[in-house]
Amino acid sequence: GDSTGIFPANNGTADDLEILIRYILEKHPGIFKITAQEKAEIFENSKAIKKELLNINGYASSRPNFLGGKTGFTDEANGNLVSIFEYKGHKILLIVFGTSNRFEQTDILFNWVKEAYIF
């Protein structure tokens, strides 16, 4: 298998990602807690070497209601973004594929959800 997801035969739909994300949220919620952090420290070689990892997802540092997500980019697929937000006690999952402005598109979708649905 190709764990990087870069191999061209590896592709999925928004429905596939929704199923995967629901599973992770139910069975392994700590994964998204990690992806919501602005930065984290890891240790290599039995704690002899400390490294700081910075999250490239801007929501981790700018949106307190951001629960986690995953960014992605390839030349073939362009920008992709999976984001989970908390809004009025509900988890909002937004998935954006194939865009050069994935964060702007996610913001547009999030604002639409807030206007279109009664919570």
Set out the residue ranges of the language-model regions:
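Penicillin-recognizing serine hydrolase domain
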Residues: 1-119
